[in-house]
Curated annotation (Swiss-Prot):
InterPro entries: Mediator_Med12. Signal peptide: none annotated. Residues 1-116, 1499-1532 are annotated as: Disordered. This is Mediator of RNA polymerase II transcription subunit 12. Its main location: nucleus. It comes from Aspergillus oryzae (strain ATCC 42149 / RIB 40) (Yellow koji mold). The gene is srb8. Keywords: Activator, Nucleus, Repressor, Transcription, Transcription regulation. It is found in: Nucleus. Component of the srb8-11 complex, which itself associates with the Mediator complex. One of its GO terms (molecular function) is transcription coregulator activity. Component of the srb8-11 complex. The srb8-11 complex is a regulatory module of the Mediator complex which is itself involved in regulation of basal and activated RNA polymerase II-dependent transcription. The srb8-11 complex may be involved in the transcriptional repression of a subset of genes regulated by Mediator. It may inhibit the association of the Mediator complex with RNA polymerase II to form the holoenzyme complex.
Amino acid sequence: MIPHSSAGVQSWGHPLRAVNNGSGHVDASQAVGPPDPQFEKLPTPVPQPQPRQPAVIDLTTSGGDAQELEPPPKRLRLDLPAAPSARDASPAPGSGGELRSTPGTGGSKPPSLSWRNRPVWSFQAMLSEVPGSNVMNEEDATAVAQGGKPASPPSLPVLPWKYIPESLGSNPTTSRASSPVKEVQTIPYRIETPSVAPVLKGEKVADFSPWIGNHPEDVLNEQTAKQGHYDRTQVSQNESNTARPSLYAQLKHRSGLQMLSSVFAAALEKRQNHSLVTAPSTFKPPPRVTLTDNKREAWLRDLANPSVPLRKLSRTIPHGIRGKALLDQCLNKGIPVNRAVWLAKCVGANEIRAFKRKGTSGTLALGLEAKWVRDWTASVQQFLEGVLGACGSAQWKMKMTYAVSLTARLFFERLLDHDQYLGWFLSSLEAAPVNIVPVWLLMLGIYWDNIMRYRKRGRRLAELLLVKLRQVTQPDKGGPLQPLVDRLSLYVRRLVLEHTSSVVLPGSWENHKELISSCLNLKDNVHKTIYQNLSERNSRLQLPKNHQDTAERSPQQRVIQLFDSIRSAHDISSASTACLKTIEDKAILISKLLEWTATPFRYGLCRVYTGVRLLRKWKMSGIDVDSYILSFLADVRVTSALNMENIYHIISELVRSQTFSVGRYLQWLMAKGVTNTPQPVPSDLCLLKQLPANRLPEHVRNLRNTLLYRAGIPVMEEDSAIAELKISIAQRLPNIFGAEMDSAMPTESSQPHPTWAVKSEIGQWIRHGIAGHCRDSPRYVYLLSRSTAPANNYRKLSGVSVAVDPGASALTPDEFYSVREILETFGDLSMLADILKQATRCDDDVVLASVADTVNCHFDCFCVIGATADLFRGLVESYARLKRLGNASLDLLFSLIELGLRIPSEFNTVALLRQDLTRLENKSALAAPSPLSDSIPLALSDVDPSFQEKLNQLLSSGGGMDESTMDTVFYSLMHILENSGSPAKLSANETARYLAYLRPFQPKHFDTMLIRWICGLLKSSTPSMSRILPPLIGVGCVTIHAFVFLVKKLLQSEKVAAVIPNLAGLRVDLLQLLVPLVSGKSKYADLVTYRFHVAQQEFFMKHPQETLDIICDAVALVNSETGSNPGQPDIAGCATELLDILLTQNPEVTVQYCLQGFIGKHSTSTTVLERALDNLLGFDSLAGPPTMSEAEKVVRMTDDFSLPFCQLKLQMLFNAESGRNVGNGIVDVMFKAAVEDTRSKGSNWVGFVGLMSQDIIRQVWKHHYHYKNLEAHGHPGTAKSLETAKLYLTIIEKLAYSVPEAGVQSVAPILVEKMDLLLHRLVIMQTNFNNVTMNRHGAATTQILQSRSNFERSLAFWFSAFLRMIVIHRSAFTMPSPAPRANGLQEQSRLLISILCISLARLPDSVIRLFPAADYFPHPIPSQGYRPCPGILLQTHALDVAASLIDTFPDEARQQCARFLKEKCPPFLQYQNDSRFIYLLGPMSDAAALNSLQAASLPSPAAGGSTPTPTPSSALPGAPSNPQPTAMTPAVTSASLSEGINCVASHLRLQYRGRAMGPYPVRPWELLEDAAPIVGVNDTAVNLKYFDARRVRA
């Protein structure tokens, strides 16, 4: 038969409906028999919608193939609609009605429905897995290319009883183009029987007789023309009488009917016996013969010719064609696919039968057969790789289509080792380069169902598709890959929507979840729900890696984190909105804000102004801020550790801006009242004397004074304090306040800590005085007229004052330093910002540089206030004004650049300033040396009284300077700096400024001399680096980080370190260099000292770890150095002060470093750190050794602010030398704290446990492992026991991150035993319940039923709890232990068996399937705008846990579990062939099949039984102790190597009364068509007598 070129191929994924043969029943011959891999290609008499296009491989389209039309039989009640062909590789999930197949049936091919009763396995059609796989001849291809259609004979007329006439308006005409296209044959035309012709017995067709010229019907004469042609029936005249008389007498008799029945029964029995096939199977594969090369080629050419029957070719199959050579011959000769498969079967059957003929045993023959099939599969793989590797060659598309079709046909004919082939396919897809991936994706559509049948392959496919998608979506990939991206996205989408369980990826979900979400349409509710469900399932299998993931931050902790972030982000608006969203209760929010501003565990004034800005914003948004502040003041305790000065500062700022209602506060205070007791004054009353009164209305001020008097606080003290401070300040600044205070007596302030009422009044008074201190003011003109001293001693260094603007500020550097020191001492930075704004109008470059340094020092505060940008703009304008006059200095430029670098929006301005700085330096460096410098080296000396004058003359001459002159000046200045005193009377700061002005003349030479001088200074033992370096750091010649780096490099070299005489002194100098100066020593006296202070702050913020290293190195010298010299600096005190700053500036980072590298490094460092912590926590470290009460006190005082410090303190107590008793006690304290905090729904214990060492965490964790003590025969279902267990399990969940990666090996056997115990209890409960249902009576039954219901809920809780423990300790089951356990594989198998049996048990209340994980699991924090689905059933989660274990377990554990479920399944598990079992446990390996299946080559199935293979769960409670022998069924090894329609069902068959209930496995290699020249009675590969088959007679 010539296959029709336009006939479509029926999809394998959809079964055809049964055919009605007209008599109302389905023909059995059409339903019985092995499945056909492809339908016959039959010509269709009706026009098709589209002709078949030329064969192409297109990766961007997914058009379906035209399906073969069937004759319209009578429609049955269940009829599936037509669906697109499954051969299309498009993975679109919504493609027309695609069915989700179940394992065992999803990938099967439909039975062949032959309309002529042909053998069910037809080989006349090619397997076409790709669109357009049929090959057209040249003429048709040319016709199609030219736009025409290939010629075809006219269609047969439609039979009148099959179709009704079409309506007139439907399609009156049918064009020739729409007629079916047929290939032009190269052999003589042969009549083809229409597919719609009625079929009779014996391959006869009714009413079809093609014209041949000699039929009576073809003879045209007068009679046939008039009457037509008809067949006359020959009526026999032999029967003259009827049988009625003879039969009537017999039927009339009483026993006649019985006799008639016996006769008919005997007739039917005879008929049945004679019709049965009783002859033994005479099937033999076609023999092979030895042929010459020419004959072999001729035979292959005949095989390629479809007109040569296979029965003829089966007589002379040549030797020597096998393996890859066979496939290459089929490809090169163009042998049709079905005939190529026939040849492969013939060769394979002979090869396999040869093993038995060699006299080998059955087991050995099975092994040899399995090996041969694997080798044959490898040959097919090499064949496909070879064709794929020839990409780009001539006719590659045709060859590739043929190779894909042939290999797919071999695969679905079960002629390959499925496991090996699909594993190779996935490995090839994974290793394929991007340009070859489309071809593999095309083939993926063919094997999709077989790959997704088992998790072992489905998970691997999901991961490699995601990896490929991530690879092609890299930013460097261009637009040409977009079709490939779309195709991969479609596959991923299909995976998620149709095979969700294969996308449960515990190990890689975090890496791929964003990519998966991008492939879905999350606006679609279906996609969104599935993705949320998948995300929740994966999150249940995740193990937290650190405590941040486990410890879910409370709203209060998140708000504190937002407060802390403002210091670096400076975004008040966003932080304000985020805070309001985080905590809805405004009272809690404002209370937490005020605590944050006043806590001793934070540093700096920035938090004060942050609180002010936030409160102002919230006030403007309508929040009653005043009430919440007053409530906080009423609730705060007098003994609280809060710094109430900051609270009063905030309220004072709010009063200044008229945000806080003073009148309302006074009314509230009067209504509240105060107690007349000698106790400390409460905070709400202390606020009364802190309120600024200068801007209050008169009546409010009077009321305030009255309340002060009633409270016993004299009002005159405030007035006298203000007066004293004004007099003191006026004496320091006579040019500003001299006229007002000329008559005042010199005095000092008697109040070291003035109230904010006093500070606010003084601040406004100073601001008013600075505003009036201008060059055109009468006071300044009068003072200038009385002054006789020159304005500047050294104009180059102190600045140039040029009165270009009469309204410019007349501030001098000393006046500015004094004002700045006063306001910084007060902490009134908002008033300082106003004064700095006025100072920017000054024309003194030193004052302007000091203003810039001040803004840089308080940068965070001024950013929060909002004054930084205006101040920087004003400074730049003043610099531009001085630049136009030619009076800009290096000091101002340096300060502006340092400030501008911290303002992101001013980078362009900084670039211009750097250009000016470079221009000034180049101007000095490129200038020619002046004649004055020739005589300077001889005369210039630091002992010369006129040294400063000569130096000024040299630096201001405008000329250059050669290296010798610079050397002389440099070493002279350094000599002054080292001696700290000389006849020149230059201070260290002035000397450093001269050095800064000297550097631009020769920058490189200056830096070289400076490094050489510092190295020489390190080798000497006399000078102190902490005294010499600050001035150099202040002027910018040296940086702290550069000096620390230099010292580290020098100390790393042993030769250099040996030269340095005093290493201990150097480490101490480094520590003293970082310690801020104490107040009272005029620390901000001038420009240089202030800049050094700014440099210290910058080093603390940018290099905290290096600072801690310096402290640790210095305090290690305390034991050997202290006490020997009274002048020795207090190293421990300096270190403690510095540690306090570092701990409060960045608590989390500093505490983490102290835990890792500071504690235990040296005993002295631990002591110093303990002293610093005691200062912060308020402990007295001198009270004695650590005690348990101290540890309990630390735990009790833990809150959101002190948490890091309490962690550090507890760790130090745990590591204390006093011993292990204290250490164990600390663990006990932390254990109790964890239990109490968890019971009260708190989470602080997670925080202070989180940062501690792993030893402490594991000890606390072991304390909570009480689930190990679950008694075997107790009743754990009580409410109290469940609550306690839930409490401990929650703590274990929080500490899960402490489990090491290698796992805790001792936990694995315990969990296995607990799961076995749980299964044992389940079996006992089920047995008891079955007994109760059989003997149901009275109240006892009701009580037992209630007990059973309670037990089921308890079972669900413990099952979910143990599942979580298994997830946490998953690595303990897979990681190799130091001492390998002999029963490790058995533990893995037993664990899988327990999980699967419990999860799929059919309990009366269905609690396992409906109970959502016992409401135990903590849900992750909502992210990406949605909340994960909380309704994941416990059964689903249990199967996910089993899947995650199977992913990591060896195949042996999976196979042992499968054998147990097949042979020893518990009695309440009645469905071993559950699709979920098959999905998780498949596929079976060769060894498992060999152990459980009989040799295929045996002539008949064995009737005897054998003892089943013992499994690790043979002693499992509930399993039968003496299982029934397993009946073995005939099978073949290739049945285990392939996965046909019944393969999985045959692996997991139901064992019932010693018999294996399952399908009869067939031998695919022997399913041969036309195997022998002469057809015998039982010439089939399957022995028909085993099935009571009957002969079909024509």
